[in-house]
């Protein structure tokens, strides 16, 4: 129940409040991004109303576009160093790294009490999944696994077109 309520609060804040009314600088989340290029770029670009305070990527060249977009964010190559230096300044973390690093980065973030958005796959085995589930409950944080097919703007846009009658009668979808 707690997670449903907390997730609902975060959803309302992310979707309704900022998009309709703007977000006060005093009410912005301080977000750290781990994995800045590629899929990471698509993820951090979805939270323009929040405050990106740290960015971490082992591939500095690939991350350069994101780094330049947030000149005030502190830059790191190692997420462990980022957490050591900045954990008190971070509210939530976006993790868009290669699959094999999801568990380690997520667990450190949870242990520090940070809310976490993790790209799919969430984990490599059932033990990691159960450990993450227990950690989210224990540390009372909100977590979400991203699945780009369901979290990108395109799907929402098509739904709006359908609801507005722009598409007409839909007979078949592939």
What are these regions, as identified by a protein language model?
Residues 12-70, 149-152:
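N-terminal Rossmann-like dinucleotide-binding module
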Residues 10, 98-99, 103-151, 165:
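Beta-strand-loop-alpha-helix segment that lines the small-molecule cofactor/substrate pocket
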């Amino acid at each position: 129940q707690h997670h449903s309520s907390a997730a609902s609060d975060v959803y309302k804040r992310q979707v309704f409040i900022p998009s309709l009314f703007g977000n006060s600088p005093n009410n912005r989340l301080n977000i750290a991004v781990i994995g800045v290029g590629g899929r990471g770029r698509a993820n951090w670009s979805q939270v323009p109303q929040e405050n990106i305070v740290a960015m971490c990527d082992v591939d500095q060249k690939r991350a350069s576009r994101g780094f330049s977009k947030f000149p005030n964010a502190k830059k790191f190559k190692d997420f462990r160093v980022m957490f050591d230096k900045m954990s008190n300044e971070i509210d939530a973390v976006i993790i868009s790294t290669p699959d094999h690093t999801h568990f380690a980065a997520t667990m450190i973030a949870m242990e520090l009490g940070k809310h976490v958005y993790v790209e799919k796959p969430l984990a490599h085995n059932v033990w990691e999944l159960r450990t993450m589930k227990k950690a989210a409950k224990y540390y009372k944080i909100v977590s979400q696994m991203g699945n780009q097919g369901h979290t990108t703007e395109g799907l929402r846009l098509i739904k709006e077109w359908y609801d507005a009658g722009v598409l007409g009668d839909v007979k078949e979808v592939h």
